[in-house]
């Protein structure tokens, strides 16, 4: 009988958005336990080796991490399988680069470079609000931060802006129609649009309708919605494509146009 946590992850069973080819080995790096779920995170090793190509092997990644060059959300991380996830800020002091993990329209984590100014904060979705011992109000975010004494106006599903240096809330956005949001799960993963309305289904899942910048409408569950801006002004810089998913025909035309202009 197996006791304790699993220590391995087969390459075939690894999340598809890591984009690992299945023939180069048997195993994939199993993310450590941490603030993001296994299937919704990107281990540091994959980010450094497979995305940025700063290392060729896992050993090289370990050497980079052990020199304490890599910071995630302002904290040095030396664990190569540390699970970085949505909205995390990865900073490499040595090269002066900062990245924010956000989804592209295909539902993968894009290598999205940001300025040093933007790397000072992150947005977090409020998962839970409760009153702890001695009546102290607490707030829990999507990346497992617990913040005491939050603003009483902040409710579940709102988004808060956190200063990474202090861990304090600097601002917040209400979950409301007319606000800009990103979809963080389901078939519409990575799409960005404005919330048009919310259908309440007591005892089931609330459905939120979203309209993107091209006028396409789609719906998803409330749990997959992450508010990223007031009105249609995003509080973070957006990756290429601005979260608008193209149809297959549009993608083909775009590719052909790019080919002709370069050829």
Curated annotation (Swiss-Prot):
Keywords assigned: Ribonucleoprotein, Ribosomal protein, RNA-binding, rRNA-binding
GO terms for biological process, alphabetical: translation
Residue span, S4 RNA-binding domain: 42-104
Listed InterPro entries: KOW (IPR005824), Rib_uL2_dom2 (IPR014722), Ribosomal_eS4 (IPR000876), Ribosomal_eS4_C (IPR032277), Ribosomal_eS4_central_region (IPR013845), Ribosomal_eS4_central_sf (IPR038237), Ribosomal_eS4_KOW (IPR041982), Ribosomal_eS4_N (IPR013843)
GO molecular function: RNA binding; rRNA binding; structural constituent of ribosome
GO cellular component: cytosolic small ribosomal subunit
Disulphide linkage map: none
Top-level lineage group: Eukaryota
Pfam families (alphabetical): 40S_S4_C, KOW, Ribosomal_S4e, RS4NT
Entry's family note: Belongs to the eukaryotic ribosomal protein eS4 family.
Entry-linked HAMAP family: Ribosomal_eS4
PANTHER family: 30S/40S RIBOSOMAL PROTEIN S4, SMALL RIBOSOMAL SUBUNIT PROTEIN ES4
Name of the protein in question: Small ribosomal subunit protein eS4
